[in-house]
Amino acid sequence: MAAQEDRLDSFGMQHGILLSSSPSLQPPYNHQEYAWDFQRYLNKLQSLRPSDSESFRTEINLLLDQLISQDYTPGVTGIGQEEVCAILVQACRLVQHNQEHLVSKVCQLVHYLLNRLQVIVDEQNLDFLLAFSISALKQCSSWTHADVLHALAALVYNNGSKCQKYLNELLGPTGILVNLCDPSQPDPELWREAIHCMANLCLGVPGHPYLDEPYRMTCFKNFLTVLQTPKPNIVDDIAVCTLLQNALKGIQSLLNGSKIKLLETGQLGSLLAVLKKYMFHGLPGLSIEMPTVLYPTPLAQYDGRSPTKPEQPEAAVNQPTWSKKKRKAGKQKKGHQGEESKEELKNEIGAEINKDLEKMKLCSGEAQHSLYLGPQKSPLDPHQGQVGKDHFSPQVQRYKKINSSDSEYSDAEGSLQNKIRSFQAKVRQGALSCFLSTIKSIEKKVLYGYWSAFVPDISGIGSPQSVSLMTIALKDSSPKTRACALQVLSAILDGSKQFLSVADDASDHKRAFTPLSVTLASSIRELHRCLLLAIVAESSAQTLTQIIKCLANLVSNAPYHRLKPGLLTRVWNQIKPYIRNKDVNVRVSSLTLLGAIVSAQVSLPEVQLLLQQPLYSLSQNSGSATPSDPESNRKESMLEGGKKNGLHSEHSQSCWLIRLCITLVVEPREDSYSDSEPSSTPAVMYEPSPVRLEALQVLACLVKGCFNMAQSYLIELGEVACKCMQETDASIQLHGAKLLEELGTGIVQQQKPDSIVPINLMVPINQAVTFWNMILNGPLPAALQNEQHPTLQTSACDALSSVLPEAFSNLPNDRQILCITLLLGLNHSENPLVKAAAARALGVYILFPCLRQDVMFVADTANAILMCLSDRSPNVRAKAAWSLGNLTDSLIVNMEAMGQSFQEEFSDMLLLKMLWAATEASKDKDKVKSNAVRALGNLLHFLQPYHIVKPRFCESIECAIQALVSTVLGDGTMKVKWNACYALGNVFKNTALPLGKATWTAAAYNALTTVVKACKNFKVRIKSAMALSIPFSREQYGSTEQYCDIWNALVTALQKSEDTEDFLEFKYSASLREQICQALIHLLSLASQEDLPRIRKTLLEKGDSIRNYVLHYVKSEVQGDESQREHQDRGKMLQRAIEHIRGFEELPGSNKGLIEVAYFEAILVSCDKEMEAL
């Protein structure tokens, strides 16, 4: 040990950083020896007592040096949290604050052990160590403070929630860290370390309380001050970078850990300004001056740049003369045409890259200093690591010059420069990460006010290109920084569909100003141009993946139907070659991008044409670089083979993308990529699982959005789904089931009554039967019974529910029974997802014509649904309520089609159970309630007189109607209220119910009249007015007072039909007035003599306003023959109501020439005159 101690004496510390000897000079220690030594040092420390003697100082100084000199590694047995805390606490107990040299050494030990061994101090020991450190800052000389702050930063790391006791001393108005963070601080090192401590304090730990608001704002202001300081008083560039990094990390922690109110404090513009500034920190050739605050505006932000020298004219000499090579192409012999055309393609793309890079220059002289991405790998020739010599742009040639061995500075200087560039890149990454957290902490509508500050736009004539996130993506030398910028851009684009929907450049109308729609359109075009350029220029596979993902996000949100066509074609043609890239993630993201195009824009003619491109175009140039390698040739031969051997030859509307995805999913690989991911099985080499999964998702998108094209591959896609469901990979099985569901749904959608697909272009019923026979004789039944994979069972249930009803009825009897048996069995599953899916599937099957008239199936389904309605899972109850609504719909259809025979055959006890279950469900959550009230309306409509007279039904009827009334008047969603009003209308249709006489009549009418007058949602008002017009006899409206209340409520509702706070509701006001007028005329046609005085009073008081609305309703301002017919129908309704009122004139004691008759006859006369004039 003596020799070891002598060696350790040579170690020293400077500014809290251990300057140790090389590890090669130290003897190899095993972990056990380190643990023994550590325990021995602890025992020595525990044997000492605090003293001020020279011998004590010497001994403890030696012990501390020995501890600091050890090369500890995390995870060593015997050196854990308990041992480290024990040795630190003991060392602090022994050292007194007047022993400043030892205080510094102890702090170095704290920092070293906590960082080296990655230990988080427990709360009790933390309390002691914090007290020691804070006292040291108060009592010791300033030369020790740097080491103390080092220790403090290590102590508070991830311990902010445990430091509440000391926060006021550290972060209060006169706190130690606050005072040290003053930019005028004479020692900039202390400023840097204080910011470091603050940043570590701000780190949030999930599940623990965060800093209080005052402390958060104190930290935020200090971090912002650091970032706003023009040039910190620190000579060392690396130290400046660490200061900036800590400030950025601190703000990021504040944004991630708490909802800091940037808008309320007015700090958002200031924060965004400094973030934009440091996104470009140290980027060669760029010196940007930012305003202190960015303001939200659709216009370009102020962008100050340092003046630069004009570019030397000889730079143009380096431009390759592509046109000469093009002219030479025609002189080549025929045998060399293939290679020459390929060379032409390279030249064209190189020229485009050069042209675009020139546009991206920030200033004329920056190219001389630009460390651009460097020589990039061309997708044209995967066997080359870089573009050919003649194809370098001037920027790349300069890059080669700067990085050559002829550099003007020495190796040591170069190493330092590289280190500085590395730290500057970390600052840029920190600014981008902080910006990403800022985006997540503010509303998108606020963020889009700053769109022009961060998203590129096409520059005006003569003006330079403004800096943006794409500047970093194209010009930063660090792949990680480029990826960060693209991540931020993706976050901005995510959810931007509504904001970008106003973009429009399809019409070339010249204006005196540039509207927002044109500005956004040009921004979208510039984004496409820059991202496509970045794809060609990128050399890092990881960053390339991020570019393609960002492009997919843009495609998902851009309104291409309002933009000039061609953008998607360029994206499509440029991304196709990357489907065969050697990197798995690049291939996956390329498929994701194609899927985004298909999902979001499939209806565009441009996309339809792209999907119908011939297969051979995949290997030809389509305006972008196209790789050519053995793997691509293999895929093309497989595609052609599939075309010749499969069903593809019969396809009237072929789609190369479907063929490609089928190939990627099911065809084995003949040779392997250099992928990091292993193959699926050792025997058969398939594409890596992520590629196959993405290909399946693209197939599902194609089937969903472009079924008219996919239906040509129906049987083949069914085979693909079956093959996937038979594999061992659970994810592949699941996506196979989802593809199957989309295929089934596509067939069903085609056959709907409102489908616009011509009958001759629909999938024939016999083909649908063949398809489902194949599926049911395949892996679907096994998937439904796979209890080890409940997610697959769920998807299989959803797939089974997508059977076409007409196809189901034509399936063999045993297959039908199999489907029903499996679904009824899965209804008892213990997994809520499976149970919910089975309940929903039964709700679909109950509407099948061949099943809904089967009383036994209806009864079995009802019992299964009733069981699910009492499940603990809200999702299961919601699906069960939906299915119950469908089941009761089928009861009404059967009642109308089969008459009383079906009602008598259906079990009274089961009907009563359903009534009670629906009543209880109407008190559940809104998702359950909306369908429960729908079921109640149907059940009350279904009841017959012999049901109603039974005592056990009387109570249930009254409770059910009370539940509907409560729902109408309750605070549920508008969908719930709408369904409840609809349900009450259904109740009124049942003539067997004692409407008008029962005690619940008044409550039902009161609920509807309340809603028709005051509900904010006009659709609910319309449905309530419709319900009020359903009763067909005067007796059903109850007493004269009840009748007149309904009449007055409708008149009031008519007058308020244009009163709304929500502009979106205004479009329904015309429909509302029509429905109210119809209800008023219906009431008038049923009025009794006792009702007339109230009606007359209303007409005298509000007659003028009512007249205009009724006149408009009857004449129906629609042109053409249809308006004549509609006018005649409505006119007849009013005429019948007038005749009904006129009948009272002949009664004894009645007034002749009733006001009501004259009033409405005048309306009819006015209508007739106006219609005759049409």
From Swiss-Prot:
Basic and acidic residues composition bias: residue spans: 336-346, 631-648
Keyword Repeat: yes
Each HEAT repeat, start to end: 168-207, 460-498, 523-560, 566-603
Start-end of Basic residues biased regions: 323-335
Repeat listed as a keyword: yes
Origin superkingdom: Eukaryota
UniProt name for this protein: HEAT repeat-containing protein 6
